[in-house]
Structure formats: C-alpha cells, structure tokens
Amino acid sequence: MTVLSTWLLLDFDEGLPKRLYQWGDQPDPFRLFDETELAGYSAQSPLLVRAEHNPRLLRAFNDEPDDWPGLLLVTPHPTALLLLHLRHILIIRFAGQRKGVLRYYSPRTASYFFSAQSGELATWFGPIQQLSWHGGTWRDEAEDTLGFHTMTNPEAPDWRPEANRQAFHIGSEHAEALQRQQAERFLYQWWSKNPVPSFNQAWNWLEEGRRFGLVSSDALSNNLDARCAHPDSNLPAAPPPTNEMERLEYLTTHLRQSVKDKERYS
C-alpha cells in the first residue's frame, strides 16, 4: 500500500523561522534554495516542513492561511525525490534562452500558473499528487473571492525523475498566465487608488489601451486616468502611426473632445 506524506512549503518572511518553532513540534525545515542556483539566497528561502510531524502548524495553516502563505503538498514519493523536483522547477526558461525564477510557492503565482489549462501540468506537478493553497489572482483579490484551491495529479504515483534533467521551458499557456499575473498586478495597484465601478471595467480599459499601442506602465496608467475621468467616451477608430506618447496624447484629447461634443448636443 502506498504511503502518502504531507508537506507545507511556506513562502519566506522575516518572522517565519521563529514562528515555525513556536507552532511546530518537529519543524526541521528544508530550505528550498539550498543546492540550487539560488543557494546564495538561502537565508530568504521558502521552507519545506513535514505536516504530519507538526499538527499544530498544519491546523494554523488551515485556520489562518493568510498568516502562513504557501502550499500544502501530498506525495507518495520519498523526501529526496520531492525536494529534487521542487528545486528543479525553480529555474525556468522562456522562449529563446531567457531564464527566470518561478515563484510557484507563492499562492498568488500558484493561482495563475497551476490554474492554466495546459497538458503540461502533470510534468510540473511531478511527484506531487495533490496541491492545495489559499489565495487567488489579483482579480480575485479585487472581487473579494479569495479561497482554498485544490488540484490533483493522478500520474504522480508513476512519476520518475529524468536521468538527464534539463531546465523547464515555459509553454505558451503558462507564459500567458504569468503575463496576465503581471498585468492584473499593475491594474490592481491602479484600481485600488481610483473610484472605478469594477475591476472588470478597469481591465477593459487596460485592454483598450494595449490595443491602441500603449505598452509602458506610464502610458497605460495615464490612459487609465483619462478613461476614469471620461468613462462614457468612445475610443477613436484607430491609433495614428506614431510613437507611444503621441498616441496617448491623441487618445486623451479625443476622450476630452468626445465629452464636450456630447455636452454640446445634449
């Protein structure tokens, strides 16, 4: 009979090590960054803790999840293989040879990355049979719909590490999920400071700005300010073939003029 083990992978904060020993009975944490390219940052590493050996800690994770951001993992594989995989998927490659760190242990990133509808998920899960976390996307945060999420991987019992391990390459669906995370984070920061009816409305304005050829955060933010000031105005049919700042000026001028025209003929 397969024996399952349960683990907590907790995102780092300054007080985490101390709290672990306050709440844990036998924390004995593994530092995720050890034996990886991030070993130089080991002091700020997420910590992996055996949940069955620390029932009070597991209860705290379930009862007060905002105080313990991280993942709950269930696996039929030994500790060494779980750690091997968790460390392996830390460093990822994008199109070309660009490398990055995948902060999958963050509930925010997990809500985008592991929720992407991709046939590659079993590869990313590897030895993990069940994955749970509390949180959600930036949109969920704005709409007050954060909660617990659980995903399963029926292929975990048959998983074996590759003999010649290569860096994981991000597929298009996962790349889009991470790009959406960045876009929603940018929008949430703007939306939380502005009197917009809904996050969804603000998202539509952001998408309009992108289609208009606005790319930089300053231009997109200025466009959002203009749309917020003139929410009922229509966009011009097409942007002029000029640089970004001229497109932004053309757009904001059109929005202001559209309001004046409506007032004139009302």
Task: Describe each model-derived feature in a short phrase.
Residues 1-15:
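Short, hydrophobic/proline-enriched secondary-structure or compact coil segments at domain edges
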Residues 62-64, 92-95:
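Short, charge-rich binding segments
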Residues 50, 54-57, 61-77:
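Signature for HUH/AEP ssDNA processing cores
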Residues 8-11, 49-50, 72-75, 103-104:
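Conserved beta-strand segments of the P-loop GTPase G domain that flank and frequently precede/overlap
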